[in-house]
Amino acid sequence: MGNEFRVCDDCQATNIKTLIPKLKKIDSCASIEIGCQSYCGPGRKKSFAFVNNRPVAAPNEDELIKKIEAKLNK
């Protein structure tokens, strides 16, 4: 089963225009769902994505990508 990324297009700390290409670079075969993830509180202050149904958050997008890569390489 492939990886799944879910990101919000409405949260203030998440820029999907830059995040989506980075997620595709990590796993080009992963499914990517864009829409509200009901994670609004943390989404105001931190960049986040759900990776295989688990939330991953970081203060900025670069740190988020590092955390996602680490999570998938376990």
From Swiss-Prot:
Domain of life of the source: Bacteria
Signal peptide region: none
Pfam families in the record: DUF1450
HAMAP family: UPF0741
Record family assignment: Belongs to the UPF0741 family.
Protein name: UPF0741 protein Bcer98_3905
